[in-house]
């Protein structure tokens, strides 16, 4: 086994004494920092590399702190207007994961960079912490590398806002295997609408 494989196994055993202590200390450290800050290097080099990170120019790591819990509907004094069925304010569940929210915040803050992917680095009772891998698409090291040229194209601008990252695809019902066969047409909503719409075609 290589060094990265050992590192991967360490992160899998989060209940071990070493990891429990490390995660607890790191959570304390991250809480003292701002909600969005640049990390000098990835906390999990093995995970970052599996997602496409390389320790060379053009790659940037940002650490994001996201508050845990459900999403409250942002309405003044709870006035939602409309029918009682839509009066919910507090028990609303957000459709996307906190990880995709972290990616979106990083993408907004660093408008000139492209979000590649992200991974979990810690959590406590109040916050979850993620590290987001971003790429500077105007750097020569990125533009000249055949492996990263795809992300320099304009179609990949703000891919995190459109649910095109790995974390964003999960909430869209997209993936490989038998669990995702029913999401035909690239949208869970479109698939549901097609199944639940009565279509009476004229016989010609």
Swiss-Prot record:
Keywords: Cytoplasm, Ribonucleoprotein, Ribosomal protein. The keyword Transmembrane helix does not apply. Gene3D superfamilies: Ribosomal protein l15e. One of its GO terms (biological process) is cytoplasmic translation. It is found in: Cytoplasm. Pfam families: Ribosomal_L15e. Its main location: cytoplasm. GO terms for molecular function: RNA binding; structural constituent of ribosome. GO terms for cellular component: cytosolic large ribosomal subunit. Belongs to the eukaryotic ribosomal protein eL15 family. Component of the large ribosomal subunit. Component of the large ribosomal subunit. The ribosome is a large ribonucleoprotein complex responsible for the synthesis of proteins in the cell. PANTHER family: LARGE RIBOSOMAL SUBUNIT PROTEIN EL15 (PTHR11847:SF4), RIBOSOMAL PROTEIN L15 (PTHR11847). This is Large ribosomal subunit protein eL15. It comes from Cyprinus carpio (Common carp).
């Amino acid at each position: 086994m290589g060094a990265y494989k050992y590192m991967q196994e360490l992160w899998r055993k989060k209940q071990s004494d070493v990891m429990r202590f490390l995660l607890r200390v790191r959570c304390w450290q991250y809480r003292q920092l701002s909600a969005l800050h640049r990390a000098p290097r990835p906390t999990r080099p093995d995970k970052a590399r599996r997602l496409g990170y390389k320790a060379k120019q053009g790659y940037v790591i940002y650490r994001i702190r996201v508050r845990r819990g459900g999403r409250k509907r942002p309405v003044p004094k709870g006035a939602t207007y409309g029918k009682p069925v839509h009066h919910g304010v507090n028990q609303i569940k957000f459709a996307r994961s906190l990880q995709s929210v972290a990616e979106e915040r990083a993408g907004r803050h660093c408008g000139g960079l492209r979000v590649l992917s992200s991974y979990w680095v810690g959590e406590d009772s109040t916050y979850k912490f993620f590290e987001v891998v971003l790429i500077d698409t105007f750097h020569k090291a990125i533009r000249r590398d055949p492996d990263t040229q795809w992300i320099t194209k304009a179609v990949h601008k703000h891919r995190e806002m459109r649910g095109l990252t790995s974390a964003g695809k999960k909430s869209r019902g997209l993936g490989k295997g038998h669990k995702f066969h029913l999401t035909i047409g690239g949208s869970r909503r479109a698939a549901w609408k097609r199944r639940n719409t009565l279509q009476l075609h004229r016989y010609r």
